[in-house]
Structures are given as C-alpha cells and as structure tokens.
C-alpha cells in the first residue's frame, strides 16, 4: 500500500493520519500527528487461539525521551521500564478497547503506541488512543470498533476539549472520556468538588467530541480498511451445555444464593468440583478430553454468571441479600497503629483497608521527570493488594498495573482537598494496605485515607468518601447497584467508582464490559452514588468530625521563615558551607525554595527556634532609626567603625560622636568600647552610617557655638567625608 494521508481539524489543532508508509508488517498501523505530537500505533494478532480462559490483550504506551528533546537519566542512558504515567496511559487506552472484542475471542492481540514527538499542548495519550483504535480498525483483526477518547477541562464556566497545558492548570476538572459512536464506555476523572450536573454535562460534551473523531476514523477505514480475518471463538458444545444445565443448574443456583461470601464460595466450588470430577472420569480417555473439560469449566462459569444476573434483574435480590441501593455494614477507626503519623482502618462488609500516613520535609518529594518539564510531586497515594486479602496465594512483588491504577485513583480523589503548600509545607504519603477484599477495595482505601489524614492533623478542606456502583443490563432493562461486591463486579456490566465530599465529586472512574451506557444510566448512577457517599461520610464524621489541630508527636514539626531572594545565597553559603554548618549545629532539616521560603523541620521545637534565630541573624539588615548596642572595632581619623551584629558594621563619623566638637576620635573612643548607636543612613550599596550623638540630648546653643558648629560641619563635609567613605569601602 502506498502512503495515504488523511487530515482534519479537531479542537483547534490539525489532526493528520498517515497510513501505508511505516510499520507495514503489522496487521495494522497508523502514524498520528496531532499538533506537534506524533504517535505510531501498531497492532498485531497471534495466528492461533491462546489456551487461557481470558482474552490476552496487551496495550503498551512507550514514552521515548527524544520525543521531548530529553536525554535519558541513569547509568545506562536508555529508556527502561515504563513510568507511572505511561502505565496509567496504557490502562486508559486498554479499558475502552477491551469490551469491543467478541465474547469468546482468545487470540493474543498487542497494540504498541510509541510517542515519537511530544507537544504538551496536544495530547499524546489521546492521539495514542485514536491511533490504537484506528490501527485495529483498518487491520484484519476482528475488532468491533472504532472507539475514541478526549480530555475535557472546565474553566470559567466553559468546557474545553483537549485543553492546553496552561488550561489544564487552571481547570477545575481533569476528565478523560471514551466511547463508541453510540455510547460512553470509559471515564477517568479528577475534579475540584464539582456537582453531579456539571460532571454529567462534561461527560456528554466529551462524547460529542468522541463522535466527531469516530466519524473521521470511519472515513479512513472505508478508504484503507482490510477485510476481517476469520478466527475461532471459544464456544462450548451445545449438547454438553444442555446436559450440564439440566442436571446441575438447581444445585448451582442454591449455592449462589448463599449470602455469606466464604460459605457461598465453598458451596459453589463444591458443585463445580463434583461436576468436573464426573466429566473427567467419563472422558478421561477421549481424544478431545482437553476441549471437553475446557467446555465444562466454561459452562459452569456461564451458569453462575446467569444466576447472579437473574437474581438481580428478576428477583431484585443481590447475592448477599441487600437491596439494590443498600451499602454493606460500615465501620471506621482511627489511631489503629502507634508511632506512625496517622492511621485509619475502614471496613465495608468483607472489604477492609488500612491507610497509614507519613509526613516528611519537602526535600523528600518525588521528582517526576517524564516528557513534560520536571516537577516535584508532593502527595503520593500507594495501594497494595496482597493475595491473602482474598484468601488466595499468588504473585508477590512489585505493584502491577492494577495496583498502580487504584493508587492513582485514590490520589486524585484525596489531592483535591489537601491544604496548600504555604499552609502545610509537608510532603505527604499515604499507603493503603488492603487487608480484606470483596469488591470496592479502591474506594475503601479512599475512606481509610481520609481517616488517616484527619487523625494525623493534616488540615484537609473536607472528608472524602468513595463508592463503587454496578450495572446489570440485558439490553432493554437495567438495574444500577450501590456498593458492588466481588461477584457483582465479576458478573456485572459496569464498575463505576465515584469519590467526593459533601460539596461535590473529586474523582470518577468507569469501566464497562458492554459496548456503552446511556446518559440516563450515568445520571441514575451518579445520583445513587451521591446518596451512598453521604451515608459513608456520616460514619467517618462520627469517628472524627474534623482534622486534629496538632500533628502526632512522632511527626516532624515545622516552622517557616521567609528571606529576600537575594539573601538565599547568604543562607546557603559557598558550596553549601553555611547551611551545612547550621544543620550540623542544630540537627534540623532545611528546605529552601526559589522564592526565599525556608522550611525548618525537626521533632525538637528548640532546635527549630535556634535555627530561625541563626537564619534571621544571617539575613538581618540594619534599618534607619534602629538602635544597637555596638562595639568599637576600628578607629580611623574620620570616625570609628562599630560592630552591630554578625558580619554587619557601621561607621560613626567623627562629627556624629558628640554634639560638641571632637578633635580626635581616640580622645573619646577605643577599640572594644561598648556604645549605643542609632542608624541614620543606609545607602544603595548597603553602607551604614550610625550616630552616637543622635541618642544624646542636644545642648542649648549660643550664637557663638552655632557659628562654631556650622564651621565644624563644613570642616567635616564633602571632601573628607568622601575620603572616609572610600576607606570604608575597602
């Protein structure tokens, strides 16, 4: 295929797609140029069905440092494992694409998005999502797209599609919405306590823009799209299915209807093991043994799936007996751990999260160096999900994509209510340890995080709570579920997480397994989530109604002092000599920013106070009118130099020693004398003139003495004064 170029204008920027020039051996590839961002999306598919019981889709988003004109850090000077932002972007693209493959599709599919050039004002992640959908759509891979995604900002009462970097900073909303032409199928958002109405309108505005991008994709697909390949889908034997359903459906239904999770799991597993053993024995020598046993497992899964959905849609009963809008029993506790800076334990049914707060000096902030300009990240929320939380064994090691994603969701939800850096100059880390899980563990971590922050004395604007909403839909009728548990998440159609305060929403995340949901469902889910959120906040506020006024005794105390920008170098000293000496003497930690804000951290308040005194004396400036107890340090013919404080001296001119004429300075003063002086002048070079006589009562004057004084002033006037100043400079 020869190179073909397709162009349009989207959200005020040129969007160009090039097909047929690069990555021609992939099943499908698209080079997307949006503004000055360039992303190559390439899709490939395995030739055979995989043997696993899931769809092996892998979406990668690769940030090349050269794309932003940056050199890789580290010893190897080469890109390594994906950054957290790259991992989150890959998840963002995966989520709207995954539901668009047929049920039973098991061929491995891989989509690689490589950022080749980066423009902060033209969203590379959205270009990658567009390119991923297009690469799959024009290929022979049986993808039921296209899909597209956009970012939405909200500022000055207006919605902005794919905002610039500056618009994002000013926005009250950071929303990514994706979907098909017909419906929304993925949402990810952080917001500054916005109402449900504003959020819903943002979703609808975003979907309008999504449809515009899909229309552009359809134009390209019509021109260059390949015929879709015929692939084998995982389908069970109809006769075998009828036999197993007829014999064992009643037993499985009875097991599924047990309300307590562990007992239900044991009973359900017992039925499955009995059926599996029967067919294993019957077909042990059969030539299609493996296929038959795979079908048996799939049929049992489908039976359980059908019964859970039937209970909810027909009987209006959930597996644990709750109403559709009922939350599981709640419990909240603070100060669960000693010694730490703050802790909160939150339990919702059989889901439990422990959140632990740590405060640190701003020097411990995380440096984020991606394709954007390097910046310091003050707040971190980390989420850990050990396998024991669900009573299983499994991989134990570095966090995976799911844990990174859940941590980021909690971070967005809680970041909106944190105090400003000026009001609370600490680095803040929350770690959520999921101790039990039966659904909605990410939202439990948000609630536990709120408890830990308030217990630790972090002055958050308001407590935040989170809830997960679910959906069971048969295409015509639907039921929205509040506080979904694991079974409802696994067999349901939607996982819609909503976090916020009483004032509004701070975070959203939606994943679905069907092709999309309507605005009506979104509106109903948001309203139901608000009611549930308020119930949870009632429980949290009964335990701790407001943040504590003091930090934990183990937390580092902090005080601040501000110096002029041109004084920063004095505090730091040559090669850091001065600040190192202060730290060694007092044992504190010190952070200085470029605006002259100095934060001093220590568990010892006396050490903080001593440090403030030292810094204040280093940057202290004499001001006209101030009075000092000074010491004479040098005698000259034209006056005496006196030491005011630290490295600051002043000149007391011979004419400023007394009201009567002084013939010789040595007649009145000697080195080491203690004198009281008043600052009378500070010139633009920082040279200080002081006076002793200004603090003495002025004697009455005769006409003769007035003439003598006038002559004395003239005698000590400009020439000698200037000469004296030259010596002073030296």
Swiss-Prot record:
Enzyme Commission identifier(s): 2.7.7.8
Residue ranges constituting the KH domain according to the UniProt record: 556-615
Enzyme class per UniProt: transferase
Recorded GO MF terms: 3'-5'-RNA exonuclease activity; magnesium ion binding; polyribonucleotide nucleotidyltransferase activity; RNA binding
Record's catalysed reaction(s): RNA(n+1) + phosphate = RNA(n) + a ribonucleoside 5'-diphosphate
UniProt-annotated location(s): Cytoplasm
Gene Ontology biological-process entries: mRNA catabolic process; RNA processing
Bias-annotated ranges (Basic and acidic residues): 700-730
Chain segments annotated as coiled-coil in the UniProt record: none
Keywords for the protein's UniProt record, in alphabetical order: Cytoplasm, Magnesium, Metal-binding, Nucleotidyltransferase, RNA-binding, Transferase
Keyword match Acyltransferase: no
Secretion signal, residue range per the UniProt entry: none
Protein name: Polyribonucleotide nucleotidyltransferase
Organism: Streptococcus mutans serotype c (strain ATCC 700610 / UA159)
């Amino acid at each position: 295929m020869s190179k073909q170029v397709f162009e349009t204008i989207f959200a005020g920027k040129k969007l160009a797609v090039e097909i047929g020039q690069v990555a021609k051996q992939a099943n499908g590839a698209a080079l997307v140029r949006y503004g000055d961002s360039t992303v190559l999306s390439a899709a490939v598919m395995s030739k055979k069905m995989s043997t696993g019981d899931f769809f092996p889709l892998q979406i990668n988003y690769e940030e090349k440092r050269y794309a932003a004109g940056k050199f890789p850090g580290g010893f190897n000077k080469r890109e390594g494992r994906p950054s957290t932002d790259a991992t989150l972007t890959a998840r963002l693209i995966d989520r709207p694409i995954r539901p668009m493959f047929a049920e039973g599709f098991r061929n491995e599919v891989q989509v690689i998005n490589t950022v080749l050039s980066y423009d902060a004002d033209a969203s590379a992640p959205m270009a990658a999502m567009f390119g991923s959908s297009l690469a799959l759509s024009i290929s022979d891979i049986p993808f039921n797209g296209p899909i597209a995604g956009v970012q939405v900002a909200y500022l000055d009462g207006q919605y902005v599609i794919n905002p610039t970097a500056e618009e994002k900073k000013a926005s009250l909303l950071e929303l990514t919405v994706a979907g098909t032409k017909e419906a929304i199928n993925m949402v990810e958002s952080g917001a500054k306590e916005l109402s449900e109405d504003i959020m819903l309108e943002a979703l609808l505005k975003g979907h309008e823009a999504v449809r515009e991008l899909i229309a552009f994709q359809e134009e390209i697909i019509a021109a260059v799209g390949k015929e879709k390949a015929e692939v084998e889908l995982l389908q069970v034997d109809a006769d075998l299915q009828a036999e197993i359903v007829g014999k064992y459906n009643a037993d499985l239904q009875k097991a599924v209807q047990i309300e307590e999770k562990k007992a239900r799991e044991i009973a359900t597993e017992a039925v499955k093991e009995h059926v599996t053993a029967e067919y294993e024995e019957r077909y042990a020598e059969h030539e299609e043994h493996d296929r038959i046993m795979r079908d048996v497992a799939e049929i049992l899964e489908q039976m359980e799936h059908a019964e859970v959905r039937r209970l909810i849609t027909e009987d209006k009963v959930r597996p644990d007996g709750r109403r559709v809008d009922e939350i599981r029993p709640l419990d909240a506790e603070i100060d669960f751990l000693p010694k730490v800076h703050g802790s909160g334990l939150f339990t919702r049914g059989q889901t439990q999260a422990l959140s632990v707060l740590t405060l640190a000096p701003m020097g411990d902030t995380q440096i984020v160096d991606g394709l954007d300009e390097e910046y310091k990240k003050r707040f971190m929320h980390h989420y850990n999900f050990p396998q024991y939380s669900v009573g299983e064994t499994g991989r134990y090691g570095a966090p995976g994509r799911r844990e990174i994603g859940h941590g980021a969701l909690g971070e967005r939800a809680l970041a909106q209510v944190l105090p400003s850096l000026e009001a609370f100059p600490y680095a803040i880390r929350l770690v959520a340890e999921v101790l039990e899980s039966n659904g909605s563990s990410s939202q439990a971590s948000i609630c536990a995080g709120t408890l830990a922050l308030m217990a630790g004395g972090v002055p958050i604007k308001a407590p935040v709570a989170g809830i997960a909403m679910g959906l069971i839909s048969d295409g015509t009728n639907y039921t929205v579920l509040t506080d979904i548990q694991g079974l409802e998440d696994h067999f349901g159609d939607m996982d819609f997480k909503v976090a916020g305060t009483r004032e509004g929403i701070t975070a959203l995340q939606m994943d679905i397994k069907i092709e999309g949901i309507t605005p009506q469902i979104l509106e109903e889910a948001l309203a139901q989530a608000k009611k549930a959120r308020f119930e949870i906040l009632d429980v949290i506020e009964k335990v701790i109604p407001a943040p504590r006024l003091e930090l934990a005794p183990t937390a580092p105390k902090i005080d601040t002092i501000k110096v002029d920008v041109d004084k920063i170098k004095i505090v730091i000293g040559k090669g850091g000599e001065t600040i190192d000496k202060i730290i060694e003497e007092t044992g504190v930690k010190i952070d200085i920013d470029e605006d002259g804000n100095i934060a001093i951290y220590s568990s010892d308040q006396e050490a903080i106070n001593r440090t403030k005194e030292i810094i204040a004396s280093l940057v202290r400036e004499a001001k006209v009118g101030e009075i000092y107890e000074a010491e004479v340090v040098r005698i000259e013919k034209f006056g005496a130099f006196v030491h005011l404080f630290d490295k600051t001296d002043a000149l007391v001119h011979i004419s400023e020693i007394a009201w009567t004429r002084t013939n010789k300075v040595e007649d009145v003063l000697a080195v080491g004398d203690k004198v009281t002086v008043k600052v009378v002048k500070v010139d633009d070079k920082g040279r200080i003139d002081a006076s002793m006589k200004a603090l003495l009562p002025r004697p009455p004057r005769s006409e003769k003495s007035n003439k003598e004084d006038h002559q004395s002033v003239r005698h000590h006037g400009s020439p000698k004064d200037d000469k004296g100043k030259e010596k002073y400079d030296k």
